[in-house]
Swiss-Prot record:
GO terms for biological process: fatty acid biosynthetic process. Belongs to the thiolase-like superfamily. FabH family. This is Beta-ketoacyl-[acyl-carrier-protein] synthase III. It holds the Pfam family ACP_syn_III_C. It comes from Listeria monocytogenes serotype 1/2a (strain 10403S). Pathway: Lipid metabolism; fatty acid biosynthesis. The lineage of its organism: Bacteria, Bacillati, Bacillota, Bacilli, Bacillales.
Length: 312
């Protein structure tokens, strides 16, 4: 028995903020943003819309798409950096709202790599037989910790949530390999400043991301016994088109094997990879027996990569 994905779901706020909207409030331009990041627009949550609201909506859809009910869920794992409070966890809030009376809940925090950490954690519970059905959510409301006076970072971020239901699948499907890591010495390059707003040293983060995403991708390929050409889809953290393209080139993959959502969502941190995965499923980009590589990096500094063979 292995652990795989049984259903997916997402939620993005209704409000769309384009690059042209940002031109009106800061010294930037659509051309400057697009050429450097690949971002054209992003979703921004309402003031009264919180991370747990985004996570709840995505989880609800994923459970339905898995053909399950909230009573079938054993555990909720939410990857996020924008909890409204230290406790209760976002996972506990959505467990209550969904009426999932049989489930436990916990949050994990590995910034933009958090969703990969959540998926790997869930897989261990399932493979040991401790739990059967686990909801993993990546959700963040980055707009509340964005410094809107810093044009170098304000143009990057958006809000949203993506979710998967994980459960038992056959030995030759599901999670084939993973690589999780941290380099705490780089924490100074990406963190929250004294005003609880995002600070980023873009040059250092770029170097770290390109290096670690590439190396982690090669490690999970080796551990899964796969070659680069065996990959059917690469879903990287949607931070910046240049970083994403560097990841694709490191693996010698054609353009059509790179999943891109950065243009319409921006960088949504913990939900970034999850949203891209859900869109790939909805667009028919993933079929049974496909080998899908998820890879990301985040504040910490952290990184996570994993390969899933789609299907049951």
């Amino acid at each position: 028995m292995n652990a795989g994905i049984l259903g997916v779901g997402k939620y993005v706020p209704e409000k769309i903020v384009t690059n042209f909207d940002l031109e009106k409030i800061m010294d930037t331009s659509d051309e400057w943003i697009r050429t450097r990041t690949g971002i054209e627009e992003r979703r921004i949550a309402r003031d009264d819309e919180y991370t747990h609201d985004l996570a709840y909506e995505a989880a609800k859809v994923a459970i339905k798409n898995a053909g399950l009910t909230p009573d079938d869920i054993d555990l909720f794992i939410v990857a996020t950096v924008t909890q409204e409070a230290t406790f209760p966890s976002v996972a506990n809030i959505i467990q209550d709202r969904l009426g999932a009376k049989n489930a436990a809940g916990m949050d994990v925090e590995a910034a933009c790599a958090g969703f990969t950490f959540g998926v790997v954690t869930a897989a261990q519970f399932i493979k040991t037989g401790a739990y059967k059905n686990i909801v993993v959510v990546g959700a963040d409301k980055l707009s509340k910790i964005t410094n809107w006076d810093d044009r170098t970072t304000a143009v990057l971020f958006g809000d949203g949530a993506g979710a998967v239901v994980m459960g038992p699948v056959s030995d030759d499907h599901g999670l084939l390999s993973f690589d999780l890591g941290s380099d705490g010495s780089g924490g100074k390059y990406l963190n929250l400043d004294e005003n609880k707003k995002i600070y980023m040293n873009g040059r250092e983060v770029f170097r770290f991301a390109v290096r670690q995403m590439g190396e982690a991708s090669l490690r999970v390929l080796e551990r899964a016994g796969l070659e680069k050409e065996d990959l059917d889809l690469l879903i990287p953290h949607q931070a910046n088109i240049r970083i994403m393209e560097a990841s694709r080139e490191r693996l010698n993959l054609p353009e059509e094997k790179l999943m891109k959502t950065v243009h319409k969502y921006g960088n949504t941190s913990s939900s970034s990879i999850a949203l891209a995965l859900v869109d790939a499923v909805e667009e028919g980009r993933i079929k049974d027996n496909d080998n899908v590589l998820l890879v990301g990096f985040g504040g910490g500094l952290t990184w996570g990569a994993l390969i899933i063979r789609w299907g049951k």
